[in-house]
A protein has these predicted regions:
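Extracellular carbohydrate-recognition regions
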Residues: 25-47
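Short, aromatic/His-centered strand-loop micro-motif at the edge of beta-sheets
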Residues: 136-163
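Flexible glycan-contacting loops in extracellular carbohydrate-active proteins
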Residues: 192-223
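Carbohydrate-binding surfaces in secreted/extracellular proteins
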Residues: 35, 87, 155-193
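Extracellular beta-strand elements of beta-rich domains used
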Residues: 35, 223-227
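Short carbohydrate-recognition loop motifs
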Residues: 49-70
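Secretory/extracellular carbohydrate-interaction modules
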Residues: 64-133
Length: 233
């Protein structure tokens, strides 16, 4: 039944997006999850990661990275091309995690995810750095924008209100390109246009915790997830 509900919801979103105008449109919320009960936690499904533990604590979804793993990713039930996702994420302070690894940890939002590829907003709580990046199916990363000394990024145990949108441009010289906008605490901190948007065929929306290094024991919480689409009205 869960698979059927997800499929129906995805078809509904696809139908609504057929009438949407893309970048620059007003947005309407189609999914919200405050992670307050087992039913809401169960709506979040694993997307990728070799050894990842999930749970719930004090009204939040928890992620713990396991042995020989660099990143753990999860998705919402919403599938679509032109979406915006927002969430409040916290990097947990873990004394057992080496300081060099903890410093390299990032909190991320993912759009157009599938087959290992995705657009990603990666925020580094201990470096005050934000990146918009394009991850391809072979694991290579194209950095579309990198911003340092970003005000508003909280450190370990601090809430980070993140938001990422990816909308295809529907007219003009850049028609077919994806416009990506990234926000921290309601402030626009990074943006990019990707003329190679067609390279990503995935449609999943979600979030990740990761590091460039193996990060056994690292953890994060995720709360107040919202997904929006361009309004067709």
């Amino acid at each position: 039944m869960r698979v059927l509900r997800t499929a129906i919801f995805a078809l509904l979103i696809a139908g609504m997006l057929a009438f949407a105008s893309g970048a620059g449109a007003a947005l309407i919320g189609v999914y919200r999850n405050s992670m307050e009960n087992k039913g809401q936690l169960a709506q979040i499904l694993k997307l990728s990661g070799e050894r990842c533990a999930r749970g719930g604590s004090e009204g939040a979804f928890t992620i713990t990275i396991g042995k020989a793993t660099k990143e753990c990713s999860y998705r919402t039930p919403v599938l679509g091309r032109d979406l915006e996702i927002g969430a409040t994420m916290r990097l947990l302070s873990k004394p057992q995690v080496a300081k060099s690894v903890q410093r390299s940890m990032y909190l991320a939002l993912d759009l157009r995810a599938g087959g290992g590829a995705r657009y990603q907003l990666a925020v580094y709580p201990l470096q005050d750095k934000a990146q918009i990046r394009k991850v391809r199916t072979d694991g290579t990363i194209e950095y579309l924008d990198i911003e340092k000394q970003v005000a508003g990024i909280g450190g370990a145990e601090k809430p980070n209100q993140l938001r990422l949108s990816a909308f295809n441009i529907t007219s003009g010289e850049e028609k077919g390109s994806a416009q990506l906008l990234a926000y921290v605490g309601g402030q626009l901190v990074a943006e990019a246009n990707d003329p190679g948007a067609g390279e990503l065929s995935g449609r999943a929306s979600g979030f990740s915790l990761g590091s460039a290094k193996v990060a056994k024991g690292a953890g994060a919480t995720v709360d107040d997830v919202v997904v929006r689409i361009p309004s067709p009205y």
